[in-house]
């Protein structure tokens, strides 16, 4: 089985976001997940699919609104 299952915490660590953010993405349907008992698991292929859908076209981003922090 090449498509391994990740916990919400593992996905959060990978994306450098909070676990709550991952749960919000799952509940909104933006990130596909499977339910195992009372817990959610994210297939590695679904995480890749989500990340591919989030790619930003640099020509469409207004960088003047960003801070120089």
Role assignments for model-derived ranges:
Residues 1-24, 44-69:
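Basic Lys/Arg-rich amphipathic helical interaction modules
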Residues 15-39:
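Major-groove DNA-recognition helix of helix-turn-helix-type DNA-binding domains
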